Amino acid sequence: MKAIILAAGLGSRLEELTKDRPKCLVEYKNMPLISYQLNAFLKAGINDIAVVGGYKFEVLKNYLNANFKKVKLYENTDFASSNMTYTMFCAREFMDDDTIISYSDIIYDYEFIELLKACKNELSVMVDKNWLELWKQRFSDPLSDAESMEIQDGFIKELGKKVTHIDKIDAQYIGLFKFNKSFLSSVFEVWDNLDKNRYYDSKNWKNIYMTSFLTEIINKFDNAKAIFAPKNWLEIDQKTDLEIDIF
């Protein structure tokens, strides 16, 4: 079992907090965001971990070398003109076993990882069906940032679209999922076959949202198992998120 943390982003909505560091090194309760994910993986028994950096790469490299020496580091040199999915495939060579993918701006406990480890499905996606409570703390209008998700018989049928009504949201995608080793060749095939002349939810292939990429997989394989978040978690996307005390 392996893990990849996607940490190439700038985090512009955190304003001056990312002037001298990547978003993943912004602190929540006096600890860098990425340390929460790394500690969760380690506590769950996953030691084969890679991080893909980009913005302020040397700062991230120095932090990992000082605190998590065994982590393998990859670089997305095109971080300014690409998105999360492209960042993930910068570590493609690392993906040769069951692999959990995590965003670097989310905070969760090791129990989330244990649930993904235990799932035998080809693609398992952590989702939060109790998302609204958190979103009400984060936004005056929760629907302004929430995205759609349709779940049928435990499998995700659709996700990642803007919504105007809460009924379109069975749960919220949190940015944490797993590809089983046996399914990785199919994942690579979907990526390699993206139409370079097409736009995916208004983004070109290099900037395709992760939810749009997962949608491409779902449309072809219909195999995305929903794994429900066992407890509170937190996303840090704006400065006010750092004031939320639920984790």
Mark where each language-model region is.
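Conserved beta-strand segments of alpha/beta enzyme cores
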Residues: C24, K70-K72, F155, N223-K225
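Conserved core of the sugar-phosphate nucleotidyltransferase
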Residues: Y110-V190
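Short beta-strand-to-loop acidic/aromatic patch adjacent to the donor-nucleotide binding site
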Residues: D98-I107
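Conserved N-terminal catalytic core of the sugar/cofactor nucleotidyltransferase
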Residues: K2-I5, M31-D98
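Short catalytic helix/loop segments, enriched in acidic residues and glycine
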Residues: D20-S35
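Conserved alpha/beta core of the MobA/IspD/sugar-nucleotide pyrophosphorylase nucleotidyltransferase superfamily
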Residues: M1, I166-F247
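N-terminal nucleotide-binding beta1-loop-alpha1 segment
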Residues: M1-T18
